[in-house]
């Protein structure tokens, strides 16, 4: 192929590439901060290559989705009866660059890659986001038609909404934080936010899987960070139990937690 193949169906479930129009614009002042933050980086569409980082020049290519992907390794959920695939995803970026190594370090490579997980990054003041929201979302993809059935932010994103520069703004749901894969019941799509240490997580969230409408009766606070939802069980009284596999961290109480709903 003369070019990198670009899929045409289904549409992307997450942002691809970064342009100046993708920078956050909650207020003119915050927009100016974002423009300043990326002045030493190359912006471009999906598949923009890494670049040589030199002193006094550009410091790398901003890539989106980031190297961990738009979707997470915990995967999606599929309904074989309706043909809908439910994909949670994250709106994040990485900086890709390479540099000329110091000959004194040994080796015979002309260039060395860096910036995959760390290195120079565009930094916003006071922990503000660099890009426009949502920062996490869930997309229902109709596999029969190759189209989106619905797409919704996953959570309100209070970590940003409660920021001193943002708390007085009338912002839409921004999306929380979460790497967990969803599970399905006959009517519900259950997912979770693993935003430990933030104002709106961790939380268990349920939606009507056909319409994306949030089921407030199923939302609840979780005590631990976790990766995926790993099991669902129905008992004789039709009580739904969801077992959470926690990721324990220092200073957290031990033991699993269970969510249930009649």
Predicted regions and their residues:
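Short, strongly patterned local motifs
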Residues: 233-248
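Generic hydrophobic alpha-helical membrane-segment signal
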Residues: 130, 248-249
């Amino acid at each position: 192929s003369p070019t990198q193949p670009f899929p045409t169906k289904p549409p992307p479930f997450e942002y691809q590439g970064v342009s100046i129009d993708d920078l956050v614009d909650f207020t003119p002042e915050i927009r100016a901060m974002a423009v300043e933050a990326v002045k030493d980086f190359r912006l471009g569409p999906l598949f923009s290559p890494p670049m040589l980082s030199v002193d006094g020049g550009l410091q790398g290519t901003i890539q989106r989705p980031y190297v961990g992907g738009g979707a997470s390794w915990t995967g999606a959920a599929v309904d074989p009866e309706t043909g809908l695939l439910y994909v949670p995803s994250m709106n994040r970026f990485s900086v890709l660059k390479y540099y000329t190594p110091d000959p004194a370090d040994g080796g015979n490579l002309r260039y060395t890659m860096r910036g995959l997980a760390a290195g120079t990054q565009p930094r916003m003041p006071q922990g503000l986001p660099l890009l426009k929201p949502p920062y996490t979302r869930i997309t229902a993809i109709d596999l029969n038609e190759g189209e989106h059935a619905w797409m919704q932010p996953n959570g309100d994103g209070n970590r940003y909404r409660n920021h001193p520069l943002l708390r007085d703004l009338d912002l839409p749901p921004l999306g929380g934080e979460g790497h967990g894969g969803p599970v399905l019941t006959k009517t519900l799509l259950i997912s979770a936010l693993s935003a430990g240490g933030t104002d709106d997580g961790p939380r268990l969230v349920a939606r009507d899987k056909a319409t994306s409408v949030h089921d407030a009766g199923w939302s609840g606070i979780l005590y631990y960070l976790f990766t995926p939802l790993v099991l669902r069980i129905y008992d004789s009284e039709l009580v739904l139990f969801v077992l959470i596999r926690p990721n324990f961290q220092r200073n957290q109480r031990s033991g699993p937690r269970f969510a249930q709903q009649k």
